[in-house]
Amino acid sequence: MTTPSAELPALARIRDDVRAMQAYVVADATGYLKMDAMENPFGLPPALQAALGQRLGQLALNRYPGTRQNDLKAALAAYAGAPAGSAVLLGNGSDELISLVALACARAQATVLAPVPGFVMYAMSAQLQGLGFVGVPLTADFELDEAAMLAAIAQHRPAITFLAYPNNPTATLWDEAVVQRIIDAAGAQGGIVVMDEAYQPFASRSWIERMRAQPERNGHVLLMRTLSKFGLAGVRLGYMIGPAALVAEVDKVRPPYNVSVLNTEAALFALEHADVFAAQADELRAARTELLAALRAMPGIERVWDSQANMVLVRVPDAARAYEGMKARKVLVKNVSTMHPLLAGCLRLTVGSSADNAQMLTALQASL
């Protein structure tokens, strides 16, 4: 006889905080226009798709990943313009890298700090690894509250400070001088700063330029990127660049063979054709300009924030109603209005192709 899961004695062995959590569920989006996950709408051109398939088909899948990953690390370092003396760490998506940094720093009473609202994985990884989390609210315009950030760093002395550059879900790219002062303050008390550049293909600048120009001020900075927004969300490949000594310590808690031979080869193939993905990013930036203008001209939209990513944050009179109305019209967006008080009334819209954006705008207008 099977014991109902709610009565399983073994459940008592699961941590209380884990049992209180909700598992991440990907809803079935069949038949919907997906504008909720900041995915690149463009696939590979057919010729490249065929070439990639042929290349992957030649891999020895019966063998564990080997030194081919060193080729990928070198290619990523060259592509990103990694500073001298840096190293690259690969992850199964940037989510794994966030968890690895948290795990490497998981001492008693250690703290993670980040601006909020921000990427939810910073707080979740801290919780799962037993670190405290301190969220410092942004201003009403979703800019960094420099005084509050500096005060929080002085008070909590965080082991890790996460700065998303640009931020998710606000799509803001914060002032360089303010960011540098926060990095300086975190470093002055011995902390690590992780610059999360998941949306770098759509931003006007990268922190890696500062890391090259001022290595002495950024020697405690780890810069993290992903190929998801590059156009390979299905591949799950993140990478982290930073001082070799620091990267080597985080690498010690990485599971062996965490990145598959398929992911490695697909990433190398993508970098060999970086011009294709750069052209797609150019097209999306142009589409973003058009989308921002259309949203600002739309009656009923209360506010539209500037964007340095492939998403746009808007405030509407009733976010839940607008979300459900768009869903009924087969368009999925992200209702972020309950994620943080500063996001009240807000929806996060993915920047898609011109045709996708037009369909999304029509659904939004009809749902306000």
Curated annotation (Swiss-Prot):
What EC number(s) are associated with this protein in UniProt? 2.6.1.9
What EC class does the entry list?
Answer: transferase
Species of the source: Acidovorax sp. (strain JS42)
Q: Which InterPro entries match?
A: Aminotransferase_I/II_large, HisP_aminotrans, PyrdxlP-dep_Trfase, PyrdxlP-dep_Trfase_major, PyrdxlP-dep_Trfase_small
Tell me the gene name. hisC
**Name this polypeptide is given:** Histidinol-phosphate aminotransferase
GO process annotations (BP): L-histidine biosynthetic process
Q: What lineage does UniProt assign to this protein's organism? A: Bacteria, Pseudomonadati, Pseudomonadota, Betaproteobacteria, Burkholderiales
Q: Which reaction does it catalyse?
A: L-histidinol phosphate + 2-oxoglutarate = 3-(imidazol-4-yl)-2-oxopropyl phosphate + L-glutamate
Q: Which CDD domains does the annotation name?
A: AAT_like
